[in-house]
Swiss-Prot record:
Belongs to the peptidase C12 family. Disruption phenotype: Mice have no developmental defects, are fertile, and show normal T-cell differentiation. They have normal anxiety, locomotor behavior, motor function and synaptic transmission, but show defects in spatial learning and working memory. Exhibit stress-related effects with profound apoptosis-mediated germ cell loss and also, prominent retinal degeneration with photoreceptor cell apoptosis and mitochondrial oxidative stress. Mice show reduced capacity for adipocyte differentiation and impaired insulin responses. It is found in: Cytoplasm. Preferentially binds diubiquitin; the interaction does not hydrolyze diubiquitin but, in vitro, inhibits the hydrolyzing activity on other substrates. One of its GO terms (biological process) is cellular response to insulin stimulus. It comes from Mus musculus (Mouse). This is Ubiquitin carboxyl-terminal hydrolase isozyme L3. It is an enzyme of class 3 (hydrolase).
Amino acid sequence: MEGQRWLPLEANPEVTNQFLKQLGLHPNWQFVDVYGMEPELLSMVPRPVCAVLLLFPITEKYEVFRTEEEEKIKSQGQDVTSSVYFMKQTISNACGTIGLIHAIANNKDKMHFESGSTLKKFLEESVSMSPEERAKFLENYDAIRVTHETSAHEGQTEAPSIDEKVDLHFIALVHVDGHLYELDGRKPFPINHGKTSDETLLEDAIEVCKKFMERDPDELRFNAIALSAA
C-alpha cells in the first residue's frame, strides 16, 4: 500500500467517539470497551450492540491464514448480500477510519446524523460505488483525512511517526441481512461468518475474535470495542 499514509488510530472509545462526533454522527450510539471475551465480562457491555471493531497484530501466522482463507473462498464461493457496504483500503494506517466507516455504513438506518455531517455525505456519495472506487474516494476526501489526523493525536499513547511501520490492524464485524460479516479493506471481499442476529451479534462477533487470538497464542496485542446504544 504505497502512496498515502495516515497516522494510526487507537482502539480507544474516547478517540473513536470524538472522531465520529466531529464527522457529524449524533451520539445515540457510542463505542465502549470490551474488557474480555468471557460471558460475565460481555454482560457488562451495554446492549444492543450493532458492530464490533477488533484491533489485532498482523503476524506471519495471520498472513499465511489470510492467503489460505482467500484461496478457499475463491474456490468454494460464499454468499454475500449486496446490502453489505464494503470498501478496500489503499491508504496505509487508515484501517481504523475504514473500520468505523464499515461499522456506521452497515448500520446507517440506526444512526442519527447532524445536519451537514461529513460522514453522512461520504456515505451517500459513495453508496453506488465499487469497493475500489470507495477507496479512491476516501484518498481524496480531505474532510475525513483531516479529522482522522486530529483524532490520531488524541490517544492515550503518543502517536508514532508517520513513517513508522505499524503492524496492528482494525477490522469491523457487523450484522447484515441475518449474517455476520468481517469487513477488512486488506481483503478482496467481505467474509461471511454465518448466521447472527441483532440480539446475538456481540457474542457471535467475539467468537470470531477468539479465533484470531487462537491463531496467535503468543500474541497479547488484541483489543475489541463495541458500538452500543447510548
